Amino acid sequence: MPSPLGPPCLPVMDPETTLEEPETARLRFRGFCYQEVAGPREALARLRELCCQWLQPEAHSKEQMLEMLVLEQFLGTLPPEIQAWVRGQRPGSPEEAAALVEGLQHDPGQLLGWITAHVLKQEVLPAAQKTEEPLGSPHPSGTVESPGEGPQDTRIEGSVQLSCSVKEEPNVDGQEVAPSSPPLAAQSPEGNHGHQEPASTSFHPPRIQEEWGLLDRSQKELYWDAMLEKYGTVVSLGLPPHQPEAQAQSELGMLLTGTGVCRSLRSGNESEGPPGCPEAQPPQGPGPAAWEGLSGAATPAPTVRPGTPPVPTQPTPAETRLEPAATPRKPYTCEQCGRGFDWKSVFVIHHRTHTSGPGVQSPGLATGESTEKPPQGEVAFPHHPRRSLTGPRSYPCEECGCSFSWKSQLVIHRKSHTGQRRHFCSDCGRAFDWKSQLVIHRKGHRPEVP
């Protein structure tokens, strides 16, 4: 039965709801769905309740609530990556949010570093950090139960954890560490649990960090420009990045292939390196008997009577997870080493490792067109102009000769030569580079309205 018509009434708020964080209340208000309630009047009442939890009219004045609404609308007009970065800084007023955006115009590296660390899931020059475990303490996933101590599901869960922990990890010296077998040591009569090699807590392996340090400044800038252009293309099309996190990690390993790194950063899978690369060979892991020992539930071998046909055995869940998954075909393939790439920008950077001079290019790179068609399911935009990464940078400075990839960088750089600030304050005479800074500055001269 619909509720009777009448003036809207503000719902009574609980004290616990009033004390919750404003950001959580804002997300609940903005993320409200009509399907959560039974009808339109219930939806309207729920929206009023969520709005009161966010704005808190009993604690804020009308001007403060207006500023909160203006700040929310201002952040909603920003591009997605800039909006996420500004929200992370938690601005308290619209002027503070505008000042943060202006700071990005002077120092675009802040936004690029945030995109690299949070969106592309790559840390900027991570430090090699390791956590050491006590020698006598057992690993949490190394506990092995006997067949009669617990149910079968517990033993299977333990085997999955152990199968995930046995993986080759490069140490500080760059040598491969063979997978250890702590369950075998745990079953020793002395009762020693054994220990594993300390796992690295850094995002990239130490070897990748060393190779990154060997790159010169131009190679690092070229890599950042390629990653920024790739991310900007995805954002401009309004599509989420379709590559998984492990694939984004592998592209940095492909970039460093020319300096000696043949192993990809793809977690759990090995890169497809050239035939002559010894690191691209699959590791020699333990056999089926060793994996049966790791599962903690040793099944006795069935007795076969003479004259009876062998019974086919079903693969265990642990063996099924060990089978390598089929890798999809990549649209850009290097003709010299056979390596495949999902992004043309990374393919262009990799191709430069094979060329002996700047004039050697593979077919299709000079014109900006790929030699192969895009995979099925992707949309090609032939009418969109694309900047070629093989040629020189297209925005040079007439004063010092420095070249820049983006025109905005050249505009900011030119102001360092002129030394002139075009926007002056008529009250105090201060000069500013941007008009928006002058507008914010002028508000400080106005008398505050009581």
Curated annotation (Swiss-Prot):
Primary location group: nucleus
BP GO annotations: regulation of transcription by RNA polymerase II
Low complexity composition bias: residue spans: 287-306
Family annotation (InterPro entries): KRAB, KRAB_dom_sf, SCAN-C2H2_zinc_finger, SCAN_dom, SCAN_sf, Znf_C2H2_sf, Znf_C2H2_type
Residue ranges, annotated region (Disordered): 130-155, 168-205, 263-331, 354-389
Covalent cross-link Glycyl lysine isopeptide (Lys-Gly) (interchain with G-Cter in SUMO2) as placed by the record, residue numbers: K130, K330
UniProt keyword list: DNA-binding, Isopeptide bond, Metal-binding, Nucleus, Phosphoprotein, Repeat, Transcription, Transcription regulation, Ubl conjugation, Zinc, Zinc-finger
GO cellular component: chromatin; extracellular space; nucleus
Extent of Pro residues compositional bias: 275-286
Presence of keyword Repeat: yes
Modification Phosphoserine occurs at: S137, S218
Signal peptide: none
Compartments reported by the entry: Nucleus
ZnF bounds (C2H2-type): 332-359, 395-422, 423-450
Residues annotated as domain SCAN box: 26-108
CDD domains membership: KRAB_A-box, SCAN
Keyword match Electron transport: no
Source superkingdom: Eukaryota
Protein name: Zinc finger protein 446
Taxonomic path: Eukaryota, Metazoa, Chordata, Craniata, Vertebrata
